[in-house]
UniProtKB/Swiss-Prot annotation:
Annotated segments matching region Disordered: 1-23
Keywords: Cell membrane, G-protein coupled receptor, Glycoprotein, Membrane, Receptor, Transducer, Transmembrane, Transmembrane helix
GO BP term, pick one: adenylate cyclase-activating G protein-coupled receptor signaling pathway
Similarity-based family: Belongs to the G-protein coupled receptor 1 family.
UniProt-recorded Gene Ontology molecular function terms: melanocyte-stimulating hormone receptor activity
Subunit relationships: Interacts with MGRN1, but does not undergo MGRN1-mediated ubiquitination; this interaction competes with GNAS-binding and thus inhibits agonist-induced cAMP production. Interacts with OPN3; the interaction results in a decrease in MC1R-mediated cAMP signaling and ultimately a decrease in melanin production in melanocytes.
Keyword set includes Oxidoreductase: no
Listed GO CC annotations: plasma membrane
Chain intervals with Polar residues compositional bias: 1-20
The protein, known as: Melanocyte-stimulating hormone receptor
Alphabetical list of SMART domains matching this protein: 7TM_GPCR_Srsx
Organism of provenance: Lemur catta
One Pfam match: 7tm_1
Role summary: Receptor for MSH (alpha, beta and gamma) and ACTH. The activity of this receptor is mediated by G proteins which activate adenylate cyclase. Mediates melanogenesis, the production of eumelanin (black/brown) and phaeomelanin (red/yellow), via regulation of cAMP signaling in melanocytes.
Length: 317
């Protein structure tokens, strides 16, 4: 079943979102109820993209500089930062082009603008897909390091990590190109949504299992030292908080965008769904926010990486 033409270019739909000041306001629909629409100005969108761009560039530079960080785990973290970097680049590039076109500073033929939009859409979509892939890869790497600790270095070798990374990038580019080409097909939308749900379930299962195992390990240590309750409760709260942050940030930042895709597939003309469609730009902004938060969760918690990051900053300073 084809999707309605008004939603044909999903990632390009941001082009039709008018610039406005940030506020929460009701937007009346001619045939449906009032809608709450959060308008994201181009300036704010551009600032978020630039912050993410700088942050993830520093992560990639720090990992590339320090040979001690050239391990499979940090390779996955570096690729996640690179994916988030591409999300930022595509967002900044698209917003900048729109601002220049709107101001009349950039004159281009409609066909050129359309081709540029398609390139940006493929870049943005492939970076999103690869980002989800690498989040899942990091979860699997951590799972293996905990449950197969003695065999970890024989299972997760640098050569295998490189092959996995190459396969992820190839799959991301191919699937994104197909998605942009067939974005007017419901099957294409649902495939992307199923992929997101699969990554969400994978991460939830792996991290919950890791939390359970670590909690049992902490209980065993506590029993040996005859102080079970305080250690057990304290560690349990810390582990639960970490798990909540990991999965909560992932769901809150990515969930609305994939809800948008789901609703386009199942109710493109329903008034309530149309209200949600109005916030498409907000959903993209949340993905850019995720690109800002990812380094804080996965990269900057490493003492070795923070030390190298300081050296990189001092070099440029």
């Amino acid at each position: 079943m084809p999707v309605q033409g008004s939603q044909r270019s999903l990632l390009g739909a941001v082009n039709s979102t008018p610039t406005a000041t940030p506020h929460l306001r009701p937007a009346a629909n001619q045939t449906g109820p009032q809608c709450l629409e959060v308008s994201i100005p181009d300036g704010l969108f551009l600032c978020l993209g630039l912050v993410s761009l700088v942050e993830n560039t520093l992560v990639v530079a720090a990992i590339a500089k320090n040979r001690n960080l050239h391990s499979p785990m940090y390779c996955f973290i570096c690729c996640l930062a690179l994916s988030d970097l591409l999300v930022s680049v595509s967002s900044v590039l698209e917003t900048a082009v729109l601002l220049l076109l709107g101001a009349g500073a950039l004159a281009a033929q409609a066909t050129v603008v359309q081709q540029l939009g398609n390139v940006i859409d493929v870049l943005l979509c492939s970076s999103m897909v690869s980002s989800l892939f690498f989040l899942g890869a990091i979860a699997m790497d951590r799972y293996i390091s905990i449950f197969y600790a003695l065999r970890y270095h024989s299972i997760v070798t640098l050569a295998r990590a490189r092959r996995a990374i190459a396969a992820i990038w190839a799959a991301s580019i191919l699937s994104s190109t197909l998605f942009i080409a067939y974005c007017d097909r419901t099957a294409a939308l649902l495939c992307l949504v199923v992929f997101f749900l699969a990554m969400l379930v994978l991460m939830a299962v792996l991290y919950v299992h890791m939390l359970t195992q670590a909690r049992q390990h902490a209980q065993g240590i506590a029993r040996l030292h005859k102080r079970q309750r305080p250690v057990q409760q304290g560690w349990g709260l810390k582990g639960a908080a970490t798990l909540t942050i990991l999965l909560g940030v992932f769901f809150l930042c990515w969930g609305p965008f994939f809800l948008h895709l789901t609703l386009i597939a199942v109710c493109p003309q329903h008034p309530t769904c149309s209200c949600i469609f109005k916030n498409f730009r907000l959903f993209l902004a949340l993905i850019v926010c995720n690109a800002i938060v990812d380094p804080l969760i996965y990269a900057f918690r490493s003492q070795e990486l923070r030390k190298t990051l300081k050296e990189v900053l001092l070099f440029f300073w």
